């Protein structure tokens, strides 16, 4: 039997498959056995209620979707009094996702959600659709550091930091989050983009710009996961374009310890548990006893002489053959 468990920021999860924040609600349990998931990540909540961005909020792309939801929420009181009792019926660990506009409010929010029902806190400092230009705390090292320090000093829960792919240097942001006390990184939020309706000449999204998600961004986010994994020692949760088990494996080989599914959950919620089953089968067929051993296991040969050597499956004669052209 394959051991699917992974460790993330002080938590041991039964498997590395999580729903991304904004894709999970208690209603999902009607179609998916959510108790099988590694953890449940709640939709981001803020102090006050928010109605979100103007419509239309979502448009389809060739390889994904673009959205500008704007983090609508009914506020912290509703989360604590209504949603927490709903989530408490499930056995998977609950991760509360919080956002705020000031350091004091981030600290207060962290204290508010530091309750027994919550196993970890994800701080969403990277939503690209709240400000018109996509700006957020995660675009800057000093602001990231300040928020993470304030949250970590306000709670004894593990703190996950959700980063932005729109930052100029995400590796520096990741290092700042780690130095400030973050226990894990979520890489990443959506990529800011634009889609235009060619019949109306207007933006397809009411807020003009939106966050792009889906298979089209996967190679970009995987590159960021790999680069950050080489620079920090805390676990990374990969998030972006994961639709099948091979995507999970790729992210883990690149350096992720777990993954979050977003885009695919809108199209096929049962993919959450289906991928768990497929991951166990995938590992078993290849003699991999622990899924955690996949993390960072990409073979990074700088020069490979033959196509056969480069593409040989693990356990079937893979060798590192370096060029001798200069000899």
Mark where each language-model region is.
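N-terminal capping/small domains of soluble enzymes
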Residues: 1-94, 100-101, 275, 324-327
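Flexible loop residues that form catalytic
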Residues: 22, 45, 126, 190, ...
């Amino acid at each position: 039997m394959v051991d699917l468990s992974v460790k993330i920021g002080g938590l041991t999860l039964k498997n590395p498959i999580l729903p991304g924040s904004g894709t999970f609600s208690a209603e999902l349990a009607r179609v998916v056995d959510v108790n099988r998931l590694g953890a449940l990540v709640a939709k981001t909540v803020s102090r006050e209620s928010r109605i979100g961005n103007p419509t239309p909020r979502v448009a389809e792309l060739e390889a994904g979707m673009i959205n500008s939801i704007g983090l609508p929420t009914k506020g912290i009181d509703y989360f604590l009094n209504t949603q927490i009792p709903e989530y408490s019926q499930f056995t998977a660990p609950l991760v509360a996702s919080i956002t705020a506009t000031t350091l004091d409010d981030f600290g207060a929010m962290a204290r508010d959600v530091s309750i027994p029902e919550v196993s970890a806190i994800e701080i969403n400092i990277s939503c690209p659709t709240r400000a018109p230009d996509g700006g957020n705390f995660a675009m800057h090292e000093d602001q990231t550091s300040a928020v993470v320090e304030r949250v970590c000093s306000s709670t004894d829960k593990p703190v996950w930091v959700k980063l932005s792919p729109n930052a100029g240097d995400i590796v520096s942001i990741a290092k700042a989050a780690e130095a400030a006390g973050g226990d894990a990184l979520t890489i990443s939020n959506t990529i800011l983009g634009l889609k235009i309706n060619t019949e109306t000449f207007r933006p397809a999204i009411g807020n003009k710009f939106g966050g792009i998600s889906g298979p089209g961004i996967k190679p970009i986010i995987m590159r960021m996961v790999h680069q950050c994994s080489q620079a920090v020692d805390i676990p990374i949760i990969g998030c972006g374009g994961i639709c099948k088990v091979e995507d999970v494996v790729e992210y883990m080989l690149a350096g992720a310890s777990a993954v979050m599914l977003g885009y695919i959950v809108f199209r096929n919620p049962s993919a959450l548990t289906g991928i768990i089953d497929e991951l166990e089968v995938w590992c078993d067929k290849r003699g991999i006893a622990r899924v955690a051993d996949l993390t960072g296991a990409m073979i990074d040969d700088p020069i490979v002489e033959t196509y056969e050597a480069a593409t040989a499956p693990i356990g079937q004669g893979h060798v590192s053959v370096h060029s001798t052209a200069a000899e």
